[in-house]
Amino acid sequence: MSAWWIAPLVGVLYACAAFLGVQISAAVCRNVQPFEDGPKGGQPPTAWLIGGAAFIGFTLALRGMAPPQLGLAGILTVSLVASWYSDVRVGIVSDYFTLFPLGALVLGSVILHDYGILISAIVVTVPFAVAALFSRGRGMGWGDVKLVALGGAVLGMQAAILAFAAACLIAVAVATIRRRRNEPIPFAPYLAGAIAFALTFSIL
């Protein structure tokens, strides 16, 4: 991928993927009401999501990521943007955005007899699942747990642990600054952002 126009083109395609994620998420959320004890509904930063996706695509192409991996990362972009949008909008992360891509990854790993993806997803997910269980979905929702599993499968165990530890610290810091430590907050944006950052800058 040495042609000068490749990276800008990939950036545009990733922006389109993000736009698709927004539209799909908006359609799924249209008839969904936020839970009373969940995060308050808000307005997702659509323009920033699309612009961020374009930057990620541009950066990945510039770093020489192979076309098949670029395609997979583009599909993941749809999922991450949709998860971010829905959690901010209605406080829920739909299974459509997490379990479908996770299932495809796990199925592929089983077919190839490469169980690293499955093991990474399980190991990384366990502490978040425990948190969701004990908080009864208030501090950590099950949609967040499934997004963590997807991140573990995509990034691998070590990178996912680092990324999600950073996401938790940033979420706590932001909640403290905003004086919302006792209120449920949309956590998917922090998780999705951590996955995107780790994927883009390869903390592997």
Enumerate the language-model features and the residues they cover.
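A membrane-topology feature that recognizes alpha-helical transmembrane segments
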Residues: 1-204
